[in-house]
Amino acid sequence: MPEETFEFTASRWTRGNLLFPVRIEVSRERVARIKPRLVGANEESIPISKVASVNITTGLIWAEIRIDSSGGSNPILSHGHRKADARRIRDLIEGFQTGR
């Protein structure tokens, strides 16, 4: 049975996302930030069980999301997401952590 993955793409109208917008992927197992490049991609991920907090900072239109791990490693940072998408990312992570 394939794992269900939710994907959220940052707006191309925000800094650093014009050609290759950042994607946040959330699944039952992990949350990942994927930054495509001309050749390949840069991916960082945190297991859902190790997510300590999700912080959302909203602006007029866009939101920035910060996902901290309980292991003390570098947080996942992403900007340029719609506010509704940022809240959905937080709700999915919290839901997967509680088993919903």
Give, region by region, the residue ranges found by the protein language model.
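Acidic, Ser/Thr- and proline-rich intrinsically disordered linker/docking segments
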Residues: 1-18, 26, 32-33, 40-100
